Amino acid sequence: MLFSYQRSLPRQPVPSVQDTVRKDFDWTSGVAQEFLKLQASLLQWYLQLKSWWASNYVSDWWEEFVYLRSRNSLMVNSNYYLMDFLYVTPTPVQAARAGNAVHALLLYRHRLDRQEILPTLLMGMRPLCSAQYEKIFNTTRIPGVHRDHIRHLRDSRHVAVFHRGRFFRVGTHSQSRLLSPRALEQQFQRILDDPSPACPHEEHLAALTAAPRDTWAQVRRSLKTQAQEALEAVEGAAFFVSLDSEPAGLTREDPAASLDAYAHALLAGRGHDRWFDKSFSLIVFSNGKLGLSVEHSWADCPISGHMWEFTLATECFQLGYSADGHCKGHPDPSLPQPQRLHWDLPDKIHLSISLALRAAKTLSGNIECHVFPFSRFGKSFIKRCHLSSDSFIQTTLQLAHFRDRGQFCLTYESTMTRLFLEGRTETVRSCTREACNFVRAMEDKEKTDAQCLALFRLAVDKHQALLKAAMSGQGVDRHLFALYVVSQFLHLQSPFLDQVHSEQWQLATSQIPVQQIHLFDVHNYPDYVSPGGGFGPADDHGYGVSYMFMGDDVITFHISSNKSSTRTVRLTHPGPSSLGTPASLPSCSSGFQTPSSPPARDPGVPVLKPHSPQAQGQGPQPSCFSASGSPSPSFSCT
């Protein structure tokens, strides 16, 4: 009988968890040892050869395989954003803010072209590589079916502008001279006053730049044939400007929700009002608030952050505004009207635009952004504890994530390798054994404060050691990545490298650099601080976390996750408990208290100063990259 033995068969036993873990560890160790014996020497030899003739053994491959060969949408998945001053809006006049900001950006480009920007020095001594500055302006990422490429022009004398579904070309120079801020304001105001409607499908055309790269590449071929002049005007612009029809920024009525909406508008917008291929897009909201959307392949956050600090300081403190909120100076009635770009869109592109718009709206609607200023303590308190501020935050993030998920995860923190020629970034794996020991101790009621503090300091010291190793070229992940690329070129299968390559970063983190240049004293003008910026999660069920130290007493966090994930809910509403817990340990706070007074401005109470003396140019005048204007940069970067 077929089933005659069914009742006599034993049940399958559950193996010992110790045996299973040991066997898995033995297998992993065996795979690593096999890699060292059979393949590592050959792959390393090829890397050494490359290091002799290439300026950097890994950076070009990192740009190509991580960015340019990725077929995912740039929106959310790659591009990141930077915010305006948090508490201050120098003018509510949209065209005026755009005029000053564009003029300041082009002043930065002028100094860049003349090499008047001083190299950044680490600790005032070690120069950092400046190669990434070359592609800030006049740069576009061109889509390809299998691989994108970066197109960089030596010069461009116009910007591309988007407003209410229409595209314009605005010249930035007249008789070889940069237009004044007031003249630029005049041009932007002409666009705002233009009543002409968008042509059919023109309004949503930019959604194609948010589509998967192979899809956009195929559509672009038809677009280049039918609308070459308009496409060239956008892709050949110095940068892209979006004049949004909605306000943004911190509001008194609902500060938390308004900041979240501000971040979302910069990261994704409406899916069709940003040209995501441009090196960066300047976004000017209807109430005068600014923001930046940055394409990631050409450079990392410290580069765009350096430019953004200069722009905000220059347009506010050096250029300034008149008493009525307009740019200083006089309009130029002789300037021609901004050129409206016309797109001859063939019928076969219409469906592609509609599909791209639908996908962009789905992606935009799925991303959740939260921004919150943490004001219980800041960098000065951490420094008085004789701890690294970045390591402090990274360790407490492990505690916050464990309290959210009940488990640890592979954590990615990016740090710069610009101490070396054409260096970009390296990964610090922040979820260390020491960090896990600290977190377990914090969750163990039997552990004393002294024991927890000792473990906390061990975790911070371990992270600091990993950070220094990564910055000095002794990191792990970029080397493994380069070995993996060589193995693919040689068609060598490596279970060890395949396993490393498939790892998922459920917690992607980065510190946003701040005060890379000193154009004004932030201590004298504490309201004139930017909360930094953020980026999307690296994993469908993970978080993207960036943070920035605003002055001495506030830390701003930007947290992103996907609404479609049921596992990413609580960390986006973390509250101060996990962050404040280490600071409450007795020896950490002994001898001084966390700030009892509020920060320079309560994050819940915005103060708009459209006509403040500083906004009118009566504040400190920037020294514009004096010798003392290159302080030590922050160690981390996106």
Language-model features: where?
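Long, Pro/Ser/Thr-rich low-complexity/intrinsically disordered regulatory tracts in eukaryotic proteins
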Residues: 1-278, 287-288, 295-613, 619-638
